[in-house]
Amino acid sequence: MPDQPLAVELRARRSEMMLETLEAVALRLFEQRGFSAVTVDEIAMEAHTSTRTFYRYFPAKDDVLQVMIERRSEALRVELAASPDDEPPLASLKRALGSVLSAEDPGAVRRWISVIQATPSVLRSVVGGITLKSQPVMGEFFGSRLGLPGDALVPTMLAAAAGGVIMTAHTQWFLLGGDLADTVTSSLEVLERGFGTHTGVWTEVAEGPA
């Protein structure tokens, strides 16, 4: 059936569009009325779909806040995989994040942060999502440059340090404005100065003290 690949592609695109619609509607309602005050039924109604469809995409209401983390993590993985082998690791991370963040809608990111800031009950799950999804992507990349498994101590530490800088930069951007990609990449320069940009420095980090 020659039309089957096209049909599969169309179904995948429709599914992606529904996910994006549900996420956008939910974030708007969460910001306007508060996370706890919004029901799944209301999100589905605003998105012109059914509650059953909502649960097909999200096991629970707070899983809507994980979509951005998952989307970013996959985009970051792709960008880092395309990094030149001779590019310093933190330079690669800055470039990759700059590309990923520049492609996002700043308004949607601001709504996402606004909801999280206003809802302490979801903060733990969001931080957990970042720890479980985004940081391992960075850890695998750092590990590949250091000749270590991604879950080894040094790559994990570096990923956690970078993750902390990135989250802090998001908060600063939310409070002070400006360009998110520029704020994040500028903040990562603190780590870059601390760990150096040359491969030799990273080799010493991986090998530990003599």
What are these regions (language model features)?
Residues 1-17, 192-210:
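N-terminal intrinsically disordered/low-complexity leader segments
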Residues 1-33, 37-49, 66:
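Basic, helix-initiating cap at the start of DNA-binding domains
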Residues 37, 60-65, 75-76:
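Short amphipathic alpha-helical segment with a characteristic S/N-K-E followed by hydrophobic residues
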Residues 42-45, 54, 93:
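Append "Primarily bacterial transcriptional regulators
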Residues 49-58:
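Short hydrophobic/aromatic patch on the recognition helix
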Residues 74-114, 118:
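Hydrophobic alpha-helical connector segments
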Residues 121-147, 152-160, 168:
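Amphipathic alpha-helical packing segments from all-alpha helical-bundle domains
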Residues 151-172, 182-194:
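Hydrophobic alpha-helical segments that form the core
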